[in-house]
C-alpha cells in the first residue's frame, strides 16, 4: 500500500481530539471504561506517529516532510498547513510517547474521570499541532488551545492553591501570547504579499530594526513557556498544585513548546536578530542554570524543588541554540528531548511518593526507602539521570552544549571561559541538591509514624512499567545518542549554517546553504 499521500499529520492531530468528543457518550460508573478508552486512543495515535515516522520521514532531508496544505481563507493565504522536519519530528514522537504514559499515570484519578481524560486527549492533539503547523495564525490558535485544558486540569484537580496557580499560569501565558499574535499579523501583512505561511514569511526582508522588535516580543512569549528567568515564576506554582499526569505533560511537553518556537521562529525566521541576541540568550541561559539550581537547593517542598530543577536544565537549551555551532544546536535539541523524559519520570515519582505519604515536605519524609525497595530504586535511577550521570541522556546533551559553546568562534575566548565556568557551577550544584533530596526522602531521619503506616506499600506493576518505559530511552540515548541526533541533524546543521551567515564576526567565513522553498511548500489543494 502506498502511504506517500496519506494525511499523516492531520490524522495524528485530529484523531485524539475527535475521539475525545465521544467520551461523554461512554456509559461508565466507576471510570474504568473511560480509562481504557483514553489509553487505547493514546496508544493508537502513538502507533500512527511511529508509522508515519518510519514510512514517510527521511533523516537526510533538512526540509519539511509529510507536508499537507489546504486553502482555508484564500484572500490572506490562510491555510491548514502542516509538516515535519528535524525540529518538529522528534518532539512529535516525544509528545505521543509521554502523553500515552501520562494517561496511564492518571489511573488513580477518580474525580470526574470523563472530563479529565477529555482534557488529556485535547492536549494530546493540541500539543502535536503546535509542533506540526506551518502557518503563523494557525500556530497562534494551537498555542492558545493548550491554555484551556491546562487551566482546567490545574483548577479542578490541583491542590489547595490550585486556583491561584491556574490563574497565574493563564495570565502569564495569555499575556505572552499577545506578542505572538502581534508578531504574526505584522509579519503576515509586511511587504507586498499577505501570507501567514512560515516559509514565505522567512523569505521576507524585515530590516534589522523590525527584526529586533519582533524577536524581542517573541522571546518574551516563548520565554514564558521555556521558561526563562524572570518569566519563570508561574512554573513552581503550577507544579506545586498539579497532579502527576499534569506534571508529566508540563515538564515533558509544555516547556519544550517554548524551546521549539525559539528555534523555529526566532532563529529560523529572524536570523539576523537571533545573531545579535545571541549573547543575551547565553547570559539568560547561565542565569537559568545557576539561579534555579541555587533556588532548588533551598526548597523544602518536593514538587517545587523538581520544578526549579527543570528551569535550571532548560538553561542549556538557550546556550546551545545561541552557540552558532552544529554541536551546540544539536545539544539544545537533545536536551529538550532528554529533559522531557527525565522531567516526566521525576514528577511521576513525586506523584507516586505523595500517593503513599500524603506530604510533599521533605522534613516530614524520611526512611521510606527502607520499606519500599522498588520506589527506592526508581527514585535513585531517575535522580541519577537528572544529575547527568554518564551513560544517560542528560550527560550527552549537556556535554554537547558545553563543547559546542566552548568551541564557538562567534564569541571571544574570555566570554566563553566565563560562561562555561558559570554553567559548570550549576552542573556541580545539581548533584548536591538531588542527592540531599534523596537522602531526606529515602533514608532519614526516619519518620516512624510514616514508615509504620499500612498504606506505605511498594510500587505496583503499573508504576514500575511507566518508569521502565521512561528509563529505557534515557539510558538508550545516553549509550547511543546517534539514534536520536540523526533524526534532526540535517535540519539543525542547515539552520546553524544560515545563522552563522548572520553573525557579524563570521559573515566572511560562513556559507549558508540555500533553502529550496518549493520543497518546503506543499502543492495547493482546493
Swiss-Prot record:
Transmembrane regions listed in the UniProt entry: 6-26, 36-56, 91-111, 113-133, 137-157, 169-189, 212-232, 243-263, 275-295, 306-326, 332-352, 375-397, 417-437, 464-484
Membrane topology (UniProt): Multi-pass membrane protein
GO process terms (BP): ATP synthesis coupled electron transport; electron transport coupled proton transport
Entry's EC annotation: 7.1.1.-
The UniProt record lists the keyword Ligase: no
Class of this enzyme: translocase
GO MF entry, a single one: ubiquinone binding
Keywords: Membrane, NAD, NADP, Plastoquinone, Quinone, Thylakoid, Translocase, Transmembrane, Transmembrane helix
Coiled-coil regions listed in the entry: none
Family under the similarity heading: Belongs to the complex I subunit 4 family.
HAMAP family reported for this sequence: NDH1_NuoM (MF_00491)
Protein name, per record: NAD(P)H-quinone oxidoreductase chain 4 2
Organism: Picosynechococcus sp. (strain ATCC 27264 / PCC 7002 / PR-6)
